[in-house]
Amino acid sequence: MTVHNLYLFDRNGVCLHYSEWHRKKQAGIPKEEEYKLMYGMLFSIRSFVSKMSPLDMKDGFLSFQTSRYKLHYYETPTGIKVVMNTDLGVGPIRDVLHHIYSALYVEFVVKNPLCPLGQTVQSELFRSRLDSYVRSLPFFSARAG
Amino acid sequence: MGGKCWPGARGERWRMADAVLFEFLHTEMVAELWAPDPDPGSGGKKKSLSVLEGLGFRVGQALGERLPRETLAVREELDALKFLCKDLWAAMFQKHMDGLRTNHQGTYVLQDNSFPLLIPMGSGPQYLEEAPKFLAFTCGLLCGALHTLGFQSLVTASVASLPACKSLGVGCLLPLNVVQALGHPHLWSLISAGKGNQINKL
């Protein structure tokens, strides 16, 4: 099992933070373009999923998987979106994504008076704590298929 | 962190609902006072620091009156300093100060290794230059509390590495009436005379 990468978007589609760990293949386009494509895809799929659902949805779109990776999605009431790509062996990680938001983003970005909200996160403390946390996860491993 | 919202029959103290309320309010006070000054020659930064210290002083005066109701009268310098390190710090930051040292000549160093208002900024040099403006209110707070307890003081803060507030140097504590008799030039000379001496752990 492994973690590939992680995106953090705000409600306006600004990519607040991007990290990668075991990403073997790049998209071949500038990072800014990649962020726009990712956000656009998430926006569309979220809208589509809620419209097509035959039942009332509680949490909405949570994840999708392809033949090679799984995308996990978590959205806060304020529109912050945490997106993590892992391999297929990783189960639901809603609690992990919630922890990244509540214990890392809120504590070290929202509460940091020198971090302007709505802009790319510059805090080294946030970056290092996020990296440490992801590396400590039981499913973080370099043995990617 | 949460607690009773009002004093009950058993005399529970008022408690802040959540420490983060104060943290956010403090952040906005600093941001407002550090907004870009249209007149760069007006000594804006020094003025902002003194305004923050003044706000802290007034809050410190009130807390000095409010908190020690159950304790005996504070007559000794050391009792006043212990009150700051324990009672005042607990009321403001839900923790105690990590260290208190003195040179036994009126200079005290109060140390907090994880000062709550600096914790979100990190542990490296990234925001070190910005730290002083987040300490001004607390310097005033200590000064105001001491004033209420009858001690005149000069409080300065320094940060060597975040989030430790390396020293809140409380200079030359004297009973208030003595200081007023001496006047400020003596106060300054007493403080500078005390600076070079060895500071010992209490």
From Swiss-Prot, chain A:
GO terms for biological process: COPII vesicle coating; endoplasmic reticulum to Golgi vesicle-mediated transport; vesicle coating; vesicle tethering. It comes from Mus musculus. GO terms for cellular component: cytoplasm; endoplasmic reticulum; TRAPP complex; TRAPPII protein complex; TRAPPIII protein complex. It is found in: Golgi apparatus, cis-Golgi network; Endoplasmic reticulum. This is Trafficking protein particle complex subunit 1. Belongs to the TRAPP small subunits family. BET5 subfamily. Its main location: Golgi. It comes from the Eukaryota. Disulfide bonds: none annotated. Keywords: Endoplasmic reticulum, ER-Golgi transport, Golgi apparatus, Transport. Pfam families: Sybindin. Part of the multisubunit transport protein particle (TRAPP) complex. The heterodimer TRAPPC6B-TRAPPC3 interacts with TRAPPC1 likely providing a core for TRAPP complex formation. May play a role in vesicular transport from endoplasmic reticulum to Golgi.
